[in-house]
């Protein structure tokens, strides 16, 4: 006897089952239900299993766990090209052209806002950054030099500016090359903050923010890990200084033409109408020139005339005269004739703040707020446009072109080709920050994967050094060697980092670390801001402050912290790969208090502290809020608290049940006491978790 006797003749036939027009199912056999009695006399109802009901019981569908790092499928929700008439096709073409033009316009203003943002940071903190270079005793400490490079680049938002200051100091013999190399390493770290700030603008959607923040911080982790390995190696061996000195001495470089300006030819006409800076003041402050301490960095006169003329001047004694024939005495004064150089102002600059008598800090604050607003607006609009354009076949082609590897056995070549593409694109835009910041929204919406963004970012690091090398070759003969050696140190530092963290897949730690940080930041979005403040401000400032006190104090404070970090890393590795070698208590982090091993208590604390700033709005305000959100297309999570609560109230999770459950036998069974499942308008079964299981 079969374990399921009802299934022996369970083939569906047209004679046994009919479906009426009104959707009810009726069984033709006379005894679909048989009532029996047990020993106690209680009636038992036997229900004959319908085939669709029985298959649901016997077949288990495998559940697939969704990988959050898989690229989303960008489906085309509009009409297909074949379904459009002639008028619709023409409108579609013009609409595509219009979107492409708008995309270029928003991208142009996005790049210009980055340039203005850099100028704003220089006005606000440029003089403070220049003073970091005054203390030569601190600069001799490699660790302090590295954090000075980070702080200066964060404050001026330009690694080119901080590098040019270092080159000027090396050329003036105020700073040796071996002390300048850690500053270059720190500048490489500081320049990666820009695209991390850009990634914060996509915090509205958790999935997009996970990808965007991971794609941005992969640059951070590469630079930090490279410095962690190469800075002690350079301090112990000086290999970068020796290698670059050998290259410079072996090849007889001559002064060349200035580095070509490609993107700046387009952006400078607009940004120079907003603000123009005299960046030579930063170099003079770094060289401890007291005459420019109170001088404004805002350029007032763009056209000047330098004239050399002979004038009668007084000198202390006849020995100071230019020649005996040009020396005479008039009473108590000795006079002579000397060549005097004076500068005559001819034409003022044409920018907004040229006639405003405002301090650098006020102008910098105004530009900082304005440029951040423009940056956020342009980024949001770029993401919306890309989201509407990159759909269907277009998205599939672009994603396949960017993320697909070459066929075996040449698949390994794809990553190195991506490095070359990243270097070439960065050479064109002449800024690694611009290239990586423009790539961040593409990572967020799922066009570029993290695995492909990593080599593109490494190429951007190489591309920005080639621009510096060309700029160094355009230097005058007195500074050619020093500036070229610094630029080559930057180049070989990035090459060494690529050798460490790219060729072998196992060593691509920046990808895994960035994914981990992306998972944490998408769940606790405030942690992204904490990461920026801690790694780019607090840690460098703490190291710099301890360096001011002295090297022994820095070692005494840092050693226990480094030891604890190493113990945590080793314990985490042992827990993951060989937990059997650990005591039972150390196989997990449960022995620690909950607030030390989880961010959930901190999240509750921060949520409670910030709840007073969340907007509570009335019914009328909710209508306005939803109208504004509908116009700008922003995500639901950026709406006010009351609107979000209204949207989440009574929200039932739609679970697509297997087809076997979506049958009329279940409805028949529901009439006998089982809760009937509700079906929404789209045909999706809205069921509870118990019913689905």
UniProtKB/Swiss-Prot annotation:
Its main location: membrane. Residues 111-135, 234-361, 430-485, 547-550 are extracellular. Disulfide bonds join 302-349. InterPro entries: Na/Pi_transpt (IPR003841). Residues 17-40 have a biased composition (Basic and acidic residues). The keyword Iron does not apply. Glycans are attached at residues 307, 320. One of its GO terms (cellular component) is membrane. Glycosylated. One of its GO terms (biological process) is sodium-dependent phosphate transport. Residues 1-46 are annotated as: Disordered. The chain crosses the membrane at residues 90-110, 136-156, 213-233, 362-382, 409-429, 486-506, 526-546, 551-571. It catalyses: 3 Na(+)(out) + phosphate(out) = 3 Na(+)(in) + phosphate(in). It is found in: Apical cell membrane. PANTHER family: SODIUM-DEPENDENT PHOSPHATE TRANSPORT PROTEIN 2B, SOLUTE CARRIER FAMILY 34 SODIUM PHOSPHATE , MEMBER 2-RELATED. Belongs to the SLC34A transporter family. This is Sodium-dependent phosphate transport protein 2B. The lineage of its organism: Eukaryota, Metazoa, Chordata, Craniata, Vertebrata.
């Amino acid at each position: 006897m079969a374990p399921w006797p009802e299934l022996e003749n369970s083939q569906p036939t047209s004679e046994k089952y009919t479906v009426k027009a009104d959707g009810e199912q009726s069984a033709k056999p006379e005894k679909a239900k048989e009532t029996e009695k047990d020993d106690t006399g209680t009636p038992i109802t036997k229900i004959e299993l319908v085939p669709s009901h029985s298959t649901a019981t016997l077949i288990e569908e495998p559940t697939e766990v969704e990988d959050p790092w898989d690229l989303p499928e960008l489906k085309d929700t509009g009409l297909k090209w074949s379904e459009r008439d002639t008028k619709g096709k023409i409108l579609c073409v013009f609409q595509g052209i219009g979107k492409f033009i708008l995309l270029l316009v928003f991208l142009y203003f996005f790049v210009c806002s980055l340039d203005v943002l850099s100028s704003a940071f220089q006005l606000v903190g440029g003089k403070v950054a220049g003073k970091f270079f005054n203390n030569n005793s601190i600069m001799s400490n490699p660790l302090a030099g590295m954090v000075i490079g980070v702080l200066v680049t964060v404050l001026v938002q330009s690694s080119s500016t901080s590098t040019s200051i270092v080159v000027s100091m090396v050329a003036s013999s105020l700073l040796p090359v071996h002390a300048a190399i850690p500053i270059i390493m720190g500048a490489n770290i500081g320049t990666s903050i820009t695209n991390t700030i850009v990634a914060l603008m996509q915090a509205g959607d958790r999935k997009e923010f996970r990808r965007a923040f991971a794609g941005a911080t992969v640059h951070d982790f590469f630079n930090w890990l490279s410095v962690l390995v190469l800075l002690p190696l350079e301090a112990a061996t000086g290999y970068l200084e020796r290698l670059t000195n050998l290259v410079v001495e072996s090849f007889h470089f001559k002064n060349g033409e200035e580095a070509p300006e490609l993107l700046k030819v387009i952006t400078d006409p607009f940004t120079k109408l907003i603000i123009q800076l005299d960046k030579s003041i930063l170099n003079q402050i770094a060289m401890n020139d007291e005459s420019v301490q109170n001088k404004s960095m805002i350029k007032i006169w763009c056209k000047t005339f330098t004239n050399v003329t002979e004038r009668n001047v007084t000198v202390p004694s006849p020995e100071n005269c230019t020649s005996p024939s040009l020396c005479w005495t008039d009473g108590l004064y000795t006079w002579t004739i000397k060549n005097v150089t004076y500068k005559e102002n001819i034409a003022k600059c044409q920018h907004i703040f040229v006639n405003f008598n405002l301090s650098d800090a006020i102008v910098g604050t105004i530009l900082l707020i304005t440029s951040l607003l423009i940056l956020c607006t342009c980024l949001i609009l770029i993401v919306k446009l890309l989201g509407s354009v990159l759909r269907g076949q277009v998205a599939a082609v672009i994603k396949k072109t960017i993320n697909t590897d070459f066929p075996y056995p040449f698949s390994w070549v794809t990553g190195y080709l991506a490095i070359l593409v990243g270097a070439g694109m960065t050479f064109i835009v002449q800024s690694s920050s611009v290239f990586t910041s423009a790539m961040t929204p593409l990572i967020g919406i799922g066009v570029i994967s993290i695995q492909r963004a990593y080599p593109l970012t490494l190429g951007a690091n190489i591309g920005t050094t080639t621009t510096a090398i060309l700029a160094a070759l355009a230097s005058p003969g007195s500074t050619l060697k020093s500036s070229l050696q610094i630029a080559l140190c930057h180049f070989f530092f990035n090459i060494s980092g690529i050798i460490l963290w790219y060729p072998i897949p196992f060593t691509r730690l920046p990808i895994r670390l960035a994914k981990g940080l992306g998972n944490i930041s998408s769940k606790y979005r405030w942690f992204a801001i904490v990461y920026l403040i801690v790694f780019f401000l607090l840690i460098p400032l703490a190291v710099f402050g301890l360096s001011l006190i002295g090297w022994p104090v820095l070692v005494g404070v840092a050693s226990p912290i480094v030891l604890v970090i190493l113990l945590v890393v080793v314990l985490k590795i042992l827990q993951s790969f060989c937990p059997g070698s650990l005591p039972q208590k150390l196989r997990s982090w449960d022995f620690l208090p909950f607030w030390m091993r989880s961010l959930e208590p901190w999240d509750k604390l921060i949520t409670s502290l910030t709840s007073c700033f969340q907007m509570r709005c009335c019914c009328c305000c909710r209508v306005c809020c939803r109208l504004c959100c509908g116009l700008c297309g922003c995500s639901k999570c950026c709406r006010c608290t009351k609107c979000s609560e209204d949207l989440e109230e009574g929200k039932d999770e739609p679970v697509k049940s297997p087809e076997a459950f979506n049958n009329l036998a279940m409805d028949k069974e529901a009439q006998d006491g089982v809760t009937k499942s509700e079906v929404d308008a789209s045909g999706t079964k809205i069921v509870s978790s118990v019913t689905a299981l």
